[in-house]
Amino acid sequence: MAYVSMGEAHRRITEYLNRFCDAVSYQDSSTLCRLLSFSSNSPPLLSLADALNVFQDSSSLIRQSDRFSEYGEILAHVFRSLQSYRVGNLVEAYLAFDKFANAFVQEFRNWESAWALEALYVVCYEIRVLAEKADKDLTSNGKSPEKLKAAGSLLMKVFGVLAGKGPKRVGALYVTCQLFKTYFKLGTVNLCRSVIRSIETARIFDFEEFPRRDKVTYMYYTGRLEVFNENFPAADTKLSYALQNCNPKRERNIRMILKYLVPVKLSLGIIPKDELLRNYNLHEYTKIVQALRKGDLRLLRHALQEHEDRFLRSGVYLVLEKLELQVYQRLMKKIYINQKLSDPARAHQLKLEGIAKALRWLDMDMDLDEVECIMTILIYKNLVKGYLAHKSKVVVLSKQDPFPKLNGKPVSS
């Protein structure tokens, strides 16, 4: 930290106080956003923090002027938070910011217009990020992380403020998305349901009136929830909406959407192009796609094992594991095509021994009972049309469309 004289510290603090009060007086939301964006680590805020750590009695400056003292509670907590943030005391920074945020929300509630909505977004974002950092600090010191959960409670309070009628309600979706990020981080995604119900069933909300950015984020998170619920058609609809409306320059965001949309599409029998996987660095799906195309169960299992940690973290491992049935279907189709070339008259009759032999070639050693069980499941799931002749150990395939395409429908439960 560069040396700051007492006089310079006084000047910097007074300048911030004037800029804050001007922003409120002239309803200048963009300036207010910059004044509250701690995580941006902007030079003006860092220099203010240095000044606050030199001039310790900033509260006296606030009290000296009626103009400043009108927002005294807000400003005092902002200063305390920024001081602590600058010296790396993230827990104290969070606690002070939480008090500031509550005071700011109360002030926002009293303002008739929605001029400060963007500034409120900054407050919601900053408290979530600061809570995550504070919890990381607490965990590293062997203490219980609890700040993000508390931040979630504040965000719910903000949602309640915005969920009424009037121009402020357009901000409800942004706060909802911050709540989603909080709940996903905490592993309490079940708490998302009440907020979703408010957005999707309340008559005061028209989804199309929300900003595009927020709609994309909302569809991304609700799409992920549908993946966890294994409601793949709904997940496809929501994630596809997010992809189609995402800013094409935001490649990182597109990749985040595709991390979930690709396994959803695969579950619906839709295989992405190799070019898509290359363009967005989704190499973890390359071998899975190859396994589906080839009917290679060994390759699928190898790909799942190779990227197991990544798939588990994303929550798509079980979704991808269930693709085994589609791989079996592709393998049966290959056996059928080969038999059709060598013995057209009996192409629709697949011997279980022949299937077992093909599986052994893929290092999948199964006895006939296991093969029969797999074929029974494929028939039950409508991935194969036909029936099992148990005594003769033969699968008799339908002569009409023996391997139905999913055509965007999930494998039946």
UniProtKB/Swiss-Prot annotation:
Nucleus keyword on record:
yes
Domain PCI, residue spans: 216-402
Task: Decide whether keyword Nucleus is in the record.
Answer: yes
Identify the main location.
nucleus
Q: Which UniProt keywords apply?
A: Nucleus
Q: What is known about its subunit structure?
A: Interacts with EIN2 (via C-terminus). May also interact weakly with CSN8. Interacts with DSS1(V), AMPD, SAC3A, SAC3B and At5g61290 (AC Q9FLK4). Interacts with UCH1 and UCH2. Interacts with NUP1, anchoring the TREX-2 complex on the nuclear pore complex.
| Known role | Involved in the regulation of ethylene response. Probable TREX-2 component required for nuclear RNA export. The TREX-2 complex (transcription and export complex 2) functions in docking export-competent ribonucleoprotein particles (mRNPs) to the nuclear entrance of the nuclear pore complex (nuclear basket). TREX-2 participates in mRNA export and accurate chromatin positioning in the nucleus by tethering genes to the nuclear periphery.
What is the protein's name according to its record? Enhanced ethylene response protein 5
Q: What is the lineage of its organism?
A: Eukaryota, Viridiplantae, Streptophyta, Embryophyta, Tracheophyta
